[in-house]
Amino acid sequence: MGIKYSNKINKIRTFALSLVFIGLFIAYLGVFFRENIIIMTTFMMVGFLAVIASTVVYFWIGMLSTKTIQIICPSCDKPTKMLGRVDACMHCNQPLTLDRNLEGKEFDEKYNKKSYKS
């Protein structure tokens, strides 16, 4: 069983979702410090800022998602969005590329870096 690839857009969305839960957890920890109003307020504000940060990340990936190329995955025949030179299908995690020079090569995220020359 090889390496499991994941779509970049899904990775960023997962990060934003985790920020929501982490923020809520941090804010909830503030309840345990009810005696000290400064510590309680600090925990709640940090948690609130994490939730706001997740909103910013969701907004950013939504705007980025509108500019991506939509293709049909050759494996599952479902439409998927591609970000960069190489990416994975959102549905079946099939490695995909639009660069003819990279066809047949092993999937690697380094192909998306500007410093990489094919």
UniProtKB/Swiss-Prot annotation:
GO cellular component: plasma membrane
Predominant location category: membrane
A family per Pfam: DUF2614
Subcellular localization, as worded in the UniProt entry: Cell membrane
Domain of life: Bacteria
TM regions (residue ranges): 12-32, 43-63
Family membership: Belongs to the UPF0295 family.
Organism: Bacillus mycoides (strain KBAB4) (Bacillus weihenstephanensis)
Name of the protein: UPF0295 protein BcerKBAB4_0454
Key words of the record: Cell membrane, Membrane, Transmembrane, Transmembrane helix
Membrane topology: Multi-pass membrane protein
